[in-house]
Amino acid sequence: MNIRRALFLSFALLAGVTGVAQQRLPSYPGVREGQAARQALASSVSLARTSGWWQDNFTFIHPVGNETFAFDARTGQRTALTARPTRPAAGGGGRQPGRGRQFTTLASPDGSARADYKDGNLSLTENGRTTALSQDGDEARGIKYGSASWVYGEELAQNEAFGFSPNSRYVWFYRFDESRVPIYYLTLNQRDPQSTLATERYPKPGQPNPEVELYIFDRQTRQTTRMQVRPGAFDEGVGHYIFRIGWLADGRLYFRRADRRQQVLELCASDPTTGITKVLQRETNPEGWVDGDFPMFPVGNDRLLSITERNGFANWAWVGMDGTVTPLTSHQAEVRRPVHFDDQNQVLFYMALDGKRHGAQLWRVGYNGQGAARLTDPELAHQVMPSPDGQFFVVTSQSDTVPPLVRIIDRNGQVKATVAESNVESISRAGYRRTEALTFTSADGRTELNARLHYPVNFDPSKKYPMILPVYGGPLGAFQTSWNPSFELPDSYCDYGFFVLEVENRGPSGRGVAFKNAMYRHMGRAEIDDMAKGVEMARTKPGVDGNRVGIIGTSYGGYTSIMAILRYPDHFHAAVSNSNVSDWRNYDTTYTERYMDLLERNVEGYDAGRAATYAANLKGALMIYYGTADD
């Protein structure tokens, strides 16, 4: 079912109507007027954006409808083109394995060999001859070479379980022993006359995890060597998880390893011929978890650009091949992806969330840590597209209240050209108010959080309107952000007479280690408490009916929705919960234990995060739904 449709059906009671059917929607009071207002809004309001590209180091191509313009970044001159140039092919992307899976066949870089996984074993084909790299693999027994456990693909983004070295000499591969991991049964094809049964080794909190080893086969010596992936036993210390595998410029295999609690993360390098392993970087967080999915970037042959959180925020650091770690930035805010590496001038351009309301800013800093400078206006948030040589940048700038503006700047932050401007003057003529930027204090009384309030169409402050919160609320991956200051047109729920409230909560990434740690061992507490505080703030706004508040979400957002209506029944009066995890004992180990700690160490926290604990509190309307093959 379409989520937005489901929300309207469930929340119809908030607006005072019942017996909803989709085909009767236009007959509801105010719906036709709202749809007409949306059409007027779409036809009269434009937000500046660009789907353009850099044709060369100084020419930016900007398509607008059937027209195309070229901007010369050196002079700022705009030229109308009679024909649209061919867009250069984009790098990256490509095929991906299925969710939670890994590739089953891979060719060597030089094309001289191919590795294949089948039925628990890995083989290598060279010059038409096939060599078995493993022989005792057996999927039925839970032994696999060249294929990973499901949690590795799903929770650690490991989409390769074997691979070649850049020079094609070595083949690395996993060995997994899942024999102690319980089997999970999943019924599929339930809409067909005959359903099917799928099985998966699926570890839940408190259960054994898959045991992992890492091997390298040398195509020259025909020898297989086991890498030293851990200093002790599998269940003791680091090396419980082995992931993010690749090759360094000096020929060593690198990987990340973590303990089961994921409070220690080490970047390691192994000699492919001896298996001897050296730790290059170690990060710890005894009060929470260490994110293991931050990318690394090789710079030259002797160092990597990596993330460290040692000052409480994600910052850049140089990691040497000898294991020395040298901080490069020291923001009291989190950095985001590099924008451009200028190796010739030894300058890094990157983004950092140090603007107003944690908006992303473009920064530059020398490779030696000197000359750090912000190049964008901290009152706004920015998205950046560098020219191929990094001399110019297309910057889209906006805030919660300032509509987008697209400009070209140089490497000193000087504006060279305006590419596109927004036209939002017609918002009020279409019957809408601009979205309002708000702040409120977190439930612990120590943290300022952000919010946005969307007003219903044709808003009359003398009337009362129901309010909806679309939510997620849970932890986020590397370089994702808990709040993004952006200018938003009124939400489509507003067309049907709803306020829409977006709220920030503690727990996700983007605002430092302490902000994340607020969720540790107690999912379902801090984020729900903060959303309730956001509702309390919004209830003071004219027109908000504090007795008709709904909440909707999917996945972790579904969990947030069900916990909100159960823990705060006087704040939330209807909830739509799609694909929620209602009890963390039933989710997988790798995700759950990262944020909730081990079950035996935190039974109280698991109980407190279980929806059924609060079932007796339900007062309002709760809708729970799943797909027919939810994993």
At which residue positions do the language-model features occur?
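Bacterial N-terminal signal peptides
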Residues: 8-16
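Hydrophobic or amphipathic alpha-helical targeting/insertion segments
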Residues: 105-136, 160-174
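Conserved loop/turn motif of beta-propeller repeat scaffolds
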Residues: 55-57, 111, 168, 249-252, ...
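Serine-hydrolase catalytic core recognition
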Residues: 182-183, 242, 258, 383-631
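Non-catalytic accessory segments flanking enzyme active sites
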Residues: 48-52, 59-68, 78-96, 103, ...
